[in-house]
Amino acid sequence: MNENLENFSTIDLLNELKRRYACLSKPDGRYIFLGAPGSGKGTQSLNLKKSHCYCHLSTGDLLREAAEKKTELGLKIKNIINEGKLVDDQMVLSLVDEKLKTPQCKKGFILDGYPRNVKQAEDLNKLLQKNQTKLDGVFYFNVPDEVLVNRISGRLIHKPSGRIYHKIFNPPKVPFRDDVTNEPLIQREDDNEDVLKKRLTVFKSETSPLISYYKNKNLLINLDATQPANDLEKKISQHIDG
């Protein structure tokens, strides 16, 4: 038996098999989640990953992983992220391409935080064509700026799983502890009001044209992302499942 599997109880393994079996009845899908930081993309991506067995590709997570390697490039990426700026297009595309080729992405994927601009969207389209596949839809998470600031400034994250909490709107059962593992939660260095305002400025100037780009391709699905997370999850599933 694989040593990794020995770390899990039989009940946990059976529940995981049951979840994956249920995914077989769900449609394959390739989607982009488009929205500003704090719009709810990450939470809904994890929900869809669990219910449909799609792989969740967050370029933010990919870049943070690179930043933590303490290499010269990693330190450069870390500084760029903390300043609220964007990383080189070609490097991000290479990271995405590498992940899309993994077995976890065979049933489908959710691109969270990529593409950020029309040039990246065109590069992604070429990459998907090369891999003989295409997008099924682009969900746009629409949230006013003032709501985004409130959400981000109180965000807490369980790094190993990606579970997201909020100090006020979705607090953990035990302060600063993950509900499932009881491991400590963190607040990202770039989750503060000053950095967020810079990120929102960048988002509006670089990313907003994507709304028109994908609308013209009849791929855009506009969501009111101020509604409760459970209601938003149902809306997304309705679009995907038909």
Curated annotation (Swiss-Prot):
Reactions it catalyzes: AMP + ATP = 2 ADP
One Pfam assignment: ADK
Subcellular location: Cytoplasm
EC number(s) per entry: 2.7.4.3
Region (LID): 154-191
Region (NMP): 58-87
Protein residues bound to ATP: G38, S39, G40, K41, G42, T43, R155, Y165, A229
GO biological process: generation of precursor metabolites and energy
InterPro entries for the chain: Adenyl_kin_sub, Adenylat/UMP-CMP_kin, Adenylat_kinase_CS, Adenylate_kinase_lid-dom, P-loop_NTPase
Mechanisms controlling activity: Inhibited by the dinucleoside pentaphosphate compound P1,P5-di(adenosine-5') pentaphosphate (AP5A).
Source organism, top-level taxon: Eukaryota
HAMAP family named in the record: Adenylate_kinase_Adk
NCBIfam families, sorted: adk (TIGR01351), PRK00279.1-3 (NF001381)
Record-stated family: Belongs to the adenylate kinase family.
Function according to Swiss-Prot or TrEMBL: Catalyzes the reversible transfer of the terminal phosphate group between ATP and AMP. Has very low activity with CTP, GTP, ITP and UTP and no activity with GMP, CMP, UMP or IMP in vitro.
Protein name (record): Adenylate kinase 1
Organism for this UniProt entry: Plasmodium falciparum (isolate 3D7)
Lineage, opening ranks: Eukaryota, Sar, Alveolata, Apicomplexa, Aconoidasida
